[in-house]
Regions:
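An N-terminal alpha-helical hairpin/helix-loop-helix interaction module that forms a charged
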Residues: 1-85, 101-170
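A short His-aromatic
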Residues: 98
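Cytochrome P450 catalytic-core helices
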Residues: 92-95
């Protein structure tokens, strides 16, 4: 990726960066299960939409209950299967990354950028495949941030974004 494309991507991300930082500042200070302001900001940033009331209640209560605990992608994924009967790899990763910003997010942009095909929703092994896919995302970030291109992008980001010290490389 050339410098102009990197610069354009960073500039385009500025609004999202401020939204992200606000969420991460609010997270430890509020009871996210009850704080509708936090939920509104989180839902807007991560595009959480069209879920029923029970889904939001379970999601944010679990997010709150896990504060201070070392949780894993697998635990979150299986919790939502057990409590909601749903396969939610993307929202599981977003909850995890809110607790531990060093953990990557699973979304279509990340998958596209690293050429990773998600497990099919109809697969009987989708949970196992999702765990493997998430490990591949983690490995990709670990390798990329040490690569010459990764170092260049991180340095440009750090130089252009004043708040970069509050944002992890994943």
């Amino acid at each position: 990726m050339d410098d102009n494309h990197i610069l354009a991507a960073i500039i385009n991300a500025k609004k999202g960066i401020s939204q992200y930082l606000e969420i991460m500042e609010l997270f430890p200070k509020s009871n996210v299960a009850m704080d509708h302001n936090f939920q509104r900001k989180y839902n807007a940033f991560y595009r959480v939409r069209q879920r029923n009331e029970n889904w939001y209640r379970v999601y944010y209560q679990f997010m709150e209950d896990q504060k201070g605990h070392n949780i894993s992608f697998t635990e979150v994924l299986h919790y939502f299967k057990m409590k909601l009967g749903r396969y939610e790899p993307s929202f599981s990763s977003k909850l995890l990354a809110t607790h531990n910003p060093d953990m990557p997010v699973w979304d279509v942009h990340v998958q596209s950028n690293i050429d990773l095909k998600p497990p099919p929703y109809y697969s009987s092994k989708k949970f196992e495949l999702a765990q493997s896919a998430y490990q591949k995302i983690q490995a990709w970030y670990k390798d990329f941030e040490c690569s010459p291109e990764g170092e260049k992008i991180i340095n440009m980001f750090d130089n252009l974004i004043i708040e970069s010290k509050f944002i992890t490389n994943t």
